Regions:
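A detector of short terminal or domain-flanking linear segments
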Residues: 1-14, 83-139
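Short, basic amphipathic alpha-helical segments that act as recognition/interaction helices
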Residues: 3, 8-11, 28-32, 40-64
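Short amphipathic alpha-helix starts
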Residues: 15-32
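Short, surface-exposed, charged/polar-biased interaction segments
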Residues: 51-55, 66-71, 121, 132, ...
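Short, positively charged interaction helices/loops
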Residues: 55-88
């Protein structure tokens, strides 16, 4: 299984849409900053604010990731990875902060036989059949 560091997130090219509710005054202030040229658009301001807050709490995130043995970034699980686990008699616990992706050539039967649990703080990409097979194992 491959793990990609947080620094590689820009190369991954994967984003998730997030919907937030803001008060009209906050929204107006954001629009004013955009209009005055501080940010190119609303999304630019919101991304910058989120990154700044994540930087403020960066050390806490790193400690939590280390304590919980989470993969930080991208974890891609391929058929070969799962076949090796099956041959070795291992059940995998997938724990990711970022993106967990199960390859499209992985069957529901193989994931049921090899994946004990999936915990993703971020996004989980897998076929509908694989998601259904893991439904009772997704934390």
């Amino acid at each position: 299984m491959a793990a990609v560091s947080l620094e590689a997130r820009a190369r991954i090219g994967e984003t998730e849409k997030l919907t937030i509710n803001l008060g009209v005054v906050d929204l107006g202030q954001i629009d004013l900053l955009v209009q005055e040229g501080f940010y190119s658009n609303r999304t630019d301001l919101i991304r910058t604010a989120i990154r700044n807050q994540l930087a403020v709490h960066g050390e806490e995130v790193r400690r939590s990731v280390a304590r919980r043995t989470l993969v930080l970034g991208l974890q891609h699980v391929g058929r070969a990875d799962l076949e090796r686990a099956l041959s070795a008699g291992h059940m995998l616990q997938i724990q990711v902060v970022g993106l967990a992706r199960i390859a499209s050539d992985v069957s529901p039967e193989l994931v049921r036989a090899t994946i004990q649990s999936v915990e993703v703080l971020g996004a989980f990409h897998a076929s509908t059949a694989v998601r259904n097979a893991l439904a009772d194992r997704i934390l």
